[in-house]
Amino acid sequence: MTVVGPPSTEVALVHAWDDALGQPAPRRGLLLLGRPDADRLPVGEVTALLLATAGGWTGGRVATTVDCPTCPEQLEVTLTVADLLAAAPQRADRATGPFTLRWRGHRLTLRLPTPADLAGAAGAGDAAAAERWLLDACLLDADPPLADPSAALPAVSAAMAERDPLGVVAVALTCPGCGGGTEALLDVPAWAWHAADVRVRRLLDEVHRLARAYGWSEAEVLALGPHRRAAYLERVP
């Protein structure tokens, strides 16, 4: 079963999860959106869609951990979906389509990075090479041409961050163990996939218990809905 649009029911979620399992791990979160163009949308738009889709499976919270770079401490980060979505552009057209940036006498025509761009940049080598790869992909035109495109990177990055604030979800942290500072970067597609995976495996556990107890099929168990299903589960030894 191929899902069109985000899964809106438990049955649709199970099928979306099943379809995504056959794909490479980095793509699974995107596939939850059920959109063939998901990897060609601006990263911030994908982030907002995934937050809205998966937030209901996590109680509206986004949790992650990051290792302190200077001591063995592991830092926990918990954000709310509502707070993150509040950072999204308020106008529907703000984060879509090409835009222009004037920089040192140049008129740069740019587009925002997409998940497909990030995947391509990941294979470019080190961080500097990845940044240059993204600039080459997202710079549509420069008038007059740039002699050294990398010199424009700071200005381009700042303009993209202003236009698409959910393009990178980063949280500054202070380690309680050593007092050092670090930054947590949230991989929203990976978080959304983990949330879906946890939710579906819990559903399948419930299906397994009720199927053994009553002989029902998966479809029949999921059709009960969460409240009736919970009531039956209370009665299973």
Where are these regions (language model features)?
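Long C-terminal interaction/binding lobes of large macromolecular proteins
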Residues: M1-P237
